[in-house]
Amino acid sequence: MFGTRIHGRGGQGVVTAAELLSVAAFDSGRHAQAFPSFGSERTGAPVVAYCRVSENPIRTREPIVAPDALVVCDASLLGLPEVLAGLTDADLDRTIRYTA
């Protein structure tokens, strides 16, 4: 199973990105699920969404604590401890950065 956690702010398309990943995986013949984790936040508030992809049926629905891939859509969130939670130093060495 491959787990992706996506962090961003409300209005940046974080939930949509997770859903698109899961649809692409499903269209490729894999099992997939995507779900957000947020309360009654407003535009600009931190949001996290998850996407799991597997060759087998996915029976869990819990948040992804140790993701295989981490996407951060807003660099200002990197100061929040929950954003990098579950990553090891080796994971951080494989960081790909893009600045527009």
Task: Mark where each language-model region is.
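Active-site cofactor/cluster-binding pocket
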Residues: 1-100
